[in-house]
Amino acid sequence: MTEYLFTSESVSEGHPDKIADQISDAVLDAILEKDLKARVACETLVKTGMVVIAGEIGTSTWVDLEDLVRKTICTIGYTHSEMGFDGRTCAVLNAIGKQSGDIAQGVDRGEAKLQGAGDQGLMFGYACTETPTLMPAPITYAHRLVEKQAQLRHSGALPWLRPDAKSQITFRYRDNTIVGVDAIVLSTQHSEEISLKELTEAVREEIIAPIVPSKWIDKKTRFHINPTGKFVIGGPLGDCGLTGRKIIVDTYGGAARHGGGAFSGKDPSKVDRSAAYAARYVAKNVVAAGLATRCEVQLSYAIGIAEPTSIMVNTFGTGTIDDAEIVRRVQAVFDLTPYGIIEMLDLVRPIYQKTAVYGHFGRELPQFTWEKTDRSDALQQA
């Protein structure tokens, strides 16, 4: 009998790195709304009283980026200097340039089907049977905790909540099956007047209790709520935020490997993003097809080349058929060229700002086509 602990974390929409991710994807969506052929690589930095957007964009349209940045920050909830950041008054610096012609010539081919990868790289996708959405439980519940914090803040139910928050949850496993929750950490920014005792009670009753099933909570479960005792200074006043700094939060919470490429601010010609979505789509369909209870998929690409340079499937001994046979079926069922992925998942749409918080995977929204299991039958029959 094997027992172990596994932990994942998440952060709220008001965390500095997530502010940056949301701004980068807001820029991408705003441009795609007007120009579906645009090439976008937008990075964001946020710090006290300041936002810097930088990167490379190739487009025929114009977007008021300063106004967009301010609206994004205000929607998150930073609307007053008392919170340490105010979207209405912060400085917005624009350092965006044009995409390199050397890159464009390898990506933009005369025939769309020949479109090459925008860069070299390796991407991973993962699925398992721990949750109904075929995601690992630790990252799933970590996301739900900070999402609940945001819901209560936006609704006004807990008016002392502020935008910045973090969660972490540790599960106990026995023979790869969840048997309980060992620890929950939740830190939330708050206004000055709330006491730690009141905050702790409210967080346990209003955030944790509705999200984490009581069957997993026992006398051994430890709760760490605002363990430093005070969290008034938060957001960009407390820490600098950068696009792409929460890549494990964005994916599988450490339960699967990561190729290193971030997602936000990148149009779907960038395989860092589109191929990672495709790898999740493949892995989820493999598990949904009953071919395995755990599946990790690796894809890799070379700049300017359409076909992936490698495809790997690992089912960790849970496969009902050989992993090499699953690879053969994947190649038969999925077109994993950049063009094939974009068409298969309908990625040239302004859908990306929604992905920038609470995880790119495991959220079965209509826009998140990579969460469908519509190719599981084809995998069974291939």
Swiss-Prot record:
Keyword Chaperone listed: no
Residue ranges, annotated region (Flexible loop): 99-109
Binding site for Mg(2+): 17
Entry GO terms, CC: cytoplasm
Protein residues bound to K(+): 43
EC numbers on record: 2.5.1.6
UniProt main location, coarse: cytoplasm
GO terms (BP aspect): one-carbon metabolic process; S-adenosylmethionine biosynthetic process
Binding site for ATP: 15, 164-166, 230-231, 239, 245-246, 262, 266
Residues reported in the UniProt entry to bind L-methionine: 56, 99, 239, 270
GO molecular function, one term: ATP binding
Cofactor: record remark: Binds 2 divalent ions per subunit.
Domain of life (superkingdom): Bacteria
Pfam families, per database record: S-AdoMet_synt_C, S-AdoMet_synt_M, S-AdoMet_synt_N
Enzyme class: transferase
Swiss-Prot/TrEMBL cofactor(s): Mg(2+); K(+)
The family this protein is said to belong to: Belongs to the AdoMet synthase family.
The protein's name: S-adenosylmethionine synthase
